[in-house]
Regions:
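N-terminal capping/lid subdomain adjacent to the active-site entrance of alpha/beta enzymes
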Residues: 1-178, 183-185, 189-192, 199, ...
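N-terminal start-of-chain detector that recognizes signal peptides
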Residues: 2-7, 14, 92-94, 201-202, ...
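Short, solvent-exposed coil/turn elements at secondary-structure transition points
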Residues: 9-12, 127, 235, 289, ...
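Active-site donor-binding loop signature of nucleotide-sugar glycosyltransferases
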Residues: 47, 208, 313
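A short pocket-lining beta-strand/turn micro-motif at the edge of beta-sheets
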Residues: 69, 76-79, 254, 279-285, ...
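Structural signal for conserved beta-strand scaffold positions within catalytic alpha/beta enzyme cores
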Residues: 123, 257, 312-313
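Catalytic core of soluble alpha/beta enzymes
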Residues: 155-296, 300, 319-330
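C-terminal alpha-helical cap/extension of soluble enzyme domains
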Residues: 288-352
Length: 352
């Protein structure tokens, strides 16, 4: 028998997080406390839909979450098929069950979970004004990141080109891999021209150059862009297997980016990977502004994929009121240190 308790929490960013959908100052999450009533063991999960972005960012989310948790606790298992439309809820349940079943934060046995190997990550440059972004780029370069991802679309395009030129004046493509994320900021009419201008800086890839939902436009861009395109928002809400196949076969992207909270939980992300690999499409894994509870789950799973290219797993460190986890960014890798003490869940959740 299981019980599932829902603990809402508002997290506060250390500094405003600028995205294409505005600036985040706080972050609403729902923690799930799953308890085995026979053994007393528990697992903690995190449901963290992104406002105006997640397909399950619904007005009645708390009620829906309560109903699903009640049903899951009664059944004793996760209804993966039934939860396809609700990726953030599925991810929270997956995380809670994985934690309980492992009775440890080391959900799977990997060199990462044993503290023997880090996961390479990119240094993320948030949207901001020119001076802010310039300073952040300097910090990431000094910290030793070999892959830097710059969010673009917030300031004038010419100024963004200046920022990329600044990086390339100091580091060649062999020294630092550059990725950009447009978050759908380009118009279909301007996109190819801007991609051609960006190509001057020997970029690894660009995420979501145009707004999601324009499959034919994106298909044409993926076929004609001088450097690779990665789909991100395009995958949101594409939850059924047949639709995933149709999307990949229509657009034929070079990469897809997988965020379990947005793209079907861990189970749904695995399905995306299988379908992508069958088509020769690359991928990497990214967190989506979760706290350390969600970040650890994503990182533990990501490590089972044995990633070689940099992943997007640094965002758990963004909050002033995060829970302490044995996760650390060292150089340009995320490390897990199992010898460190486990988080103080009773105090943090104030319910156990």
């Amino acid at each position: 028998m299981y019980t599932l308790k829902i603990i809402p929490r508002t997290l506060h960013f250390k500094q405003p997080a600028g995205t294409s959908r505005g600036v985040y100052h706080t972050r609403q999450v729902w923690y799930l406390l799953l308890t085995d009533t026979e053994t007393g063991q528990y697992g903690v999960g995190e449901c963290a839909p992104l406002p105006a972005l997640s397909c399950d960012d619904l007005p009645d989310y708390p009620r829906l979450l309560a109903e699903i948790c009640e049903k899951t606790a009664a059944n004793g298992y996760i209804d993966y098929e039934g939860l396809r439309p609700y990726p953030s809820i599925l991810f929270g349940l997956e995380t809670a069950f994985a934690h309980l079943q492992a009775n440890s934060l080391q959900f799977w046995d990997t060199p990462f979970s044993r503290g023997e190997q880090g996961i390479p990550i990119n240094g993320l440059i948030w949207m901001g004004n020119f001076d802010e972004m310039y300073r952040r780029i300097e910090e990431k370069m000094k910290a030793g990141f070999r892959c830097i991802k710059v969010k673009i679309g917030a300031i004038e395009f010419e100024r963004e080109l200046e920022l990329l030129a600044h990086i390339r004046r100091h580091f060649s493509a062999a020294d630092i891999e550059l990725r950009v994320d447009a978050n759908g900021a380009f118009s279909p009419e301007d996109a190819l021209r801007k991609l051609t201008q960006l190509n001057e800086f020997q970029l690894h890839s660009i995420e979501q150059p145009v707004r999601a939902g324009q499959w034919e436009v994106m298909k044409e861009l993926c076929a004609t862009s001088p450097f690779p395109i990665a789909l991100d928002e395009e995958l949101i809400g594409v939850n059924e297997t047949e639709r995933k196949i149709l999307l990949l076969d229509t657009i034929r992207p070079q990469y897809i980016i997988l965020k379990p909270s947005l793209h079907g939980g861990i189970q749904g992300s695995k399905e995306w990977i299988t379908l992508a690999q069958e088509r020769g499409i690359g991928y990497w894994v990214t967190s989506a502004l979760e706290s350390n509870i969600g970040l650890n789950a994503i990182a533990q799973w990501c490590a089972t994929l044995q990633p070689k290219m940099p992943q997007g797993l640094g965002t758990g460190m963004l909050f002033t009121d995060n829970i302490d986890y044995p996760l650390h960014i060292e150089g340009d890798c995320l490390w897990f240190h199992p010898e460190e003490k486990i988080p103080d869940f009773p105090t943090y959740l104030q319910t156990i």
